[in-house]
Every structure is written in structure tokens, then in C-alpha cells.
């Protein structure tokens, strides 16, 4: 991905008169770059084999699933609660961004570098702060109803982790089912002070929980443990809950 600019280089004239100390959050640009894609990671090795990562990955587009809208809504509520009165504006990526693109942008922000389209928006709207919401990559750590943490390899962004071999107990009726589906999120929230072009707070977010087949039903493919509507609801709910925690964590 190209087109990065050092924030000082483009915005220096505008921001030079402002104090270098971290400014109050008066005018914030929220850049939620999550997009609508859903990553499906399927484990293909034995449940206790952690020596080698054997996973298959597939990316699906869930049109209008609204992760960025959720990000904006959560950010507005958190900022208005913690930092009133504050001007607020939400931006989404002009084109879909891959996970690697988003990691590159978040890493660049830590060096005071952002894509040109973001810098132009910062200058135009004279933001005192940027709140950046991106996908991340992390190790699979899936919470089960028994309190265990399972999973092998890595998971990316927002999606579902599938395991066809792990045995899960249904907490409603005690029946056992083979396999699990786990909604998960791996995200990164960064708060950037435009005066200093520095990230002043950052929080990594990792959350996942395992679900068994409903009511002990026999379903060969864990992907079918949830309907399409249930999958959308599970991810939206998890993104909102996790982002709420992350955004509150980076606000002063």
C-alpha cells in the first residue's frame, strides 16, 4: 500500500501554533477501517496438537454487515460520555482494505505516518485527535463454557474459528456434540494526537467464545451450527462489546 505521508509534513503549518503537549480531545476524526469482510479459519489438526499450525482460511464478504457503523456509534457514545463537548466525524476507507493494509496503517500511525487521504481529512477538519480502528492478527484463544481456552494457530480480523474435532457440551441439556464454531475479533484501537503526530494510547483487542450445536443436534459441519442471521448477530454484538471496552481504554 502506498501514499503515506508524515503527518507533520502535510499538517505542520496548520498545527505549528498548537501546543506540543497532548491537547484536550476537542475535535476527533474516527477512522474505522474494518470493512465488511468476515474471515473463516478452520482448524484441520488434532485438538491438542500445538506444534504445527494447520488451518484453512477463507474470506467472505457480508455486505452491509456494518462493522464501521458500529465502530462510529460506539466511539461517539464513549467520547461524548468521557469528553464532552467534542466535535466528531466518522470516516471509512474509500476502498476495502486487506488485513495487511490495516496493519500497515496502524503501524504507520505509530511513526506519525498516515495515508494521504487521511492526512487531507485531518487538515481539512482541523482534528485535534484521530481515533483509528483497525483489524489485527493474534493467536487463537477460544473461551469454552467450561472455562478452558482452546485453539491453535492464528486468527485474523473479525470472523469465525471452526474446529470439527473438539467435543463441546451443550450447557442447556448437557448433550455432547462434535465440533465448535467460535465468533472472534482481533482489533487494534489507536488514539493519535495530531499536535505531536504521535499515538498517545493504543489497545489491542482479542475476544472469542465457542458455541456447540444447538440442543444437541447432529450437524456434521460446525459452520451450520448458526444460521446466517445468527452469524451476523453474533459478530455485530461481539464487535460492539469489544470495541466499547477498547475505545474507553484509550480515552484519557
Please tell me what each predicted stretch does.
Residues 1-9:
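Bacterial N-terminal signal peptides that target proteins for export
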Residues 8-10, 122, 178-180:
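Residues embedded in well-ordered secondary-structure elements
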Residues 16-18:
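N-terminal signal peptide c-region/cleavage motif recognized by signal peptidases
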Residues 22-42, 141, 146-252:
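C-terminal/domain-edge helix-coil "capping" segments
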Residues 44-171, 184-188, 192-202:
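N-terminal segment of the mature soluble domain
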Amino acid at each position: 500500500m502506498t501514499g503515506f505521508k508524515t503527518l507533520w509534513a502535510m499538517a505542520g503549518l496548520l498545527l505549528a501554533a498548537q501546543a506540543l503537549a497532548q491537547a484536550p480531545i476537542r475535535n476527533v476524526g474516527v477512522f474505522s477501517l474494518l470493512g465488511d469482510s468476515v474471515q473463516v479459519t478452520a482448524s484441520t489438526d488434532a485438538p491438542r496438537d500445538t506444534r504445527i499450525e494447520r488451518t484453512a482460511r477463507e474470506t467472505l464478504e457480508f455486505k452491509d454487515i456494518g462493522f464501521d457503523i458500529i465502530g462510529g456509534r460506539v466511539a461517539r457514545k464513549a467520547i461524548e460520555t468521557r469528553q464532552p463537548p467534542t466535535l466528531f466525524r466518522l470516516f471509512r476507507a474509500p476502498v476495502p482494505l486487506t488485513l495487511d493494509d490495516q496493519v500497515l496503517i496502524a503501524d504507520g500511525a505509530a511513526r506519525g505516518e498516515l495515508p494521504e487521504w487521511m492526512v487531507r481529512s485531518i487538515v481539512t477538519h482541523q482534528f485535534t485527535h484521530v481515533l483509528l480502528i483497525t483489524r489485527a492478527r493474534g493467536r487463537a484463544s477460544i473461551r469454552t463454557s467450561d472455562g478452558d481456552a482452546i485453539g491453535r494457530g492464528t486468527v485474523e480480523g473479525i470472523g469465525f474459528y471452526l474446529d470439527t474435532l473438539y467435543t463441546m457440551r451443550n450447557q442447556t441439556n448437557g448433550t455432547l456434540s462434535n465440533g465448535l464454531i467460535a465468533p472472534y475479533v482481533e482489533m487494534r484501537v489507536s488514539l493519535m494526537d495530531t499536535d505531536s503526530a504521535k499515538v498517545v494510547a493504543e489497545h489491542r483487542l482479542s475476544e472469542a467464545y465457542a458455541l456447540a450445536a444447538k440442543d444437541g443436534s447432529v450437524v456434521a459441519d460446525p459452520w451450520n451450527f448458526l444460521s446466517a442471521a445468527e452469524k451476523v448477530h453474533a459478530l455485530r454484538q461481539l464487535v460492539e462489546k469489544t470495541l466499547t471496552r477498547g475505545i474507553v481504554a484509550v480515552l484519557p
